[in-house]
A protein has these predicted regions:
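Post-HExxH zinc-binding segment in Zn-dependent metallohydrolases
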Residues: 1-33
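Non-catalytic C-terminal accessory/binding modules of secreted extracellular proteins
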Residues: 35-202
Length: 202
């Protein structure tokens, strides 16, 4: 899983009270949340901060964009600083530096690329060896999760001051793992905050 600190296990408690939220995929997989499916066409979406999930009890504020490949899709969530996600302050590196972001962390939209073949690889214990990862955070900038250079950076999230577009020709791109177009385009991603807006076309 290319996820780093975005869903870190309980050893990440800081300072003993804020283990960070599970990733959107983890919440979906254990049936804690049922993501809201993005309609075909163009949708203007508001992503609430995941720490406010109690007000969005069923979906937890997570959105899901399916593709033409039945087991491949994208999940969207807002990892704003607050609640248990305050623990990210001491886990994430600030931009491209080697220092944690601390109180300057404001969050952003996390975009997850999922290849849901867990039942297949689990049977022969090969899930950890899958390439590309079955669950991968699309790193907006300073991509270094997959090579182990960091556990997460503020610039891995999407927000207007960092990266506001995710489509077939962006870096990273929204292509499927076979390099064909997913048909997913995300534009007009807002500034980081407890309620982020973006436009998804599919």
């Amino acid at each position: 899983m290319g996820g780093g600190s975005w869903g870190y296990k309980s050893s990440s408690e800081y300072p003993g009270a804020t283990p960070v939220h599970f990733s959107a995929w983890s919440k979906e997989k254990i049936s804690v949340c049922v993501p809201q499916t993005v309609d075909n066409g163009t949708s203007n979406i508001t992503l609430p901060a995941v720490y406010q999930s109690s007000t969005h009890a069923n979906s937890c504020g997570i959105y899901k964009a399916t593709t033409s490949t039945s087991d491949e899709y994208f999940l969207f969530e807002n990892r704003s600083s607050g609640g248990y996600d305050q623990g990210l302050n001491m886990l994430l590196l600030d931009n491209s530096s080697i220092y944690t972001v601390g109180s300057n962390y404001s969050g952003g939209a996390a975009i997850w690329h999922v290849k849901d073949i867990l039942s297949t690889c689990y049977a022969d214990n090969s899930c950890m060896n899958e390439s590309p990862p079955l669950v991968d955070l699309e790193e907006a900038n300073n991509a270094d999760l997959d090579n182990g250079s960091s556990q997460g950076r503020t610039t891995h999230l999407f927000y207007s001051a960092n990266s506001a577009t995710f489509n077939n020709s962006s870096t990273p791109d929204s292509k499927l793992y076979d390099n064909s177009s997913s048909g997913i385009s995300v534009t007009s991603i807002s500034a980081a905050g407890d309620n982020m807006t973006l436009t998804i076309s599919k």
